[in-house]
Regions:
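Soluble extramembrane regions of membrane proteins in the secretory/endomembrane system
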Residues: 1-153
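Selective detector of the "anchor" transmembrane alpha-helix that sits immediately C-terminal
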Residues: 150-174
Length: 175
């Protein structure tokens, strides 16, 4: 499933790219409870009533967490609705306050979930051949890119250089 190709942000990508971005956007992590991103999306499509009750929508704002009555930074989709009424609608406000930004971020996450449930989030390649699929090597390259945690590697390299620089400075000062 990871290698299947879809259209995402107006380009052809492996399904893994779309799924990883979806899970990353919702949870702040590239996977959820040991499940691959593809398993999360597949599970949501097959069992939406179960996934609506999973606490996977990351809400960074403590103020919004309190407003929603959350005990953790993760909300369930059902936490954001009272029946069919969207709870954030009454608090929706355009503006630059931290709460307004947190509400907008959460609203974007809810929008992605609703698009997935309505079938508009995943766009397969057209059967008529009007869109050129990726080559096998391009798919492998994208999957490799998705699997490497670049920010973690960059942090570790910078930390190592910083430590080496400090030790070199310390060595020079003690001479």
């Amino acid at each position: 499933l990871a290698r299947e190709q879809v259209i995402y942000h107006d380009r052809v990508v492996p399904f893994n790219t779309l799924a990883r971005d979806f899970v990353q956007k919702l949870t702040g992590k590239s996977s959820y409870k040991g499940l691959t991103p593809e398993q999360v999306i597949g599970g949501w499509l097959l069992y939406p009533e179960v996934w609506r009750n999973e606490s996977l929508i990351y809400i960074k704002s403590a103020e919004l967490q309190q407003l929603l009555g959350l005990k953790t930074p993760y909300a369930r989709l059902t936490d954001l609705f009272d029946g069919s009424v969207y709870r954030l609608r009454e608090h929706w406000q355009q503006g630059q306050s931290k709460l307004a930004k947190a509400i907008q971020e959460t609203d974007e996450k809810v929008g992605l979930i609703l698009m997935l449930e309505q079938g508009t989030f995943i766009q397969p390649l057209p059967a008529d051949g009007s869109v050129k699929p990726l080559s096998k090597i391009q798919v492998k390259a994208e999957l490799l890119y998705n699997s490497i945690p670049f920010s973690k590697i960059l942090f570790m390299v910078n930390l190592a250089f910083g430590l080496l620089s400090f030790l070199l400075l310390l060595h020079n000062c003690l001479r």
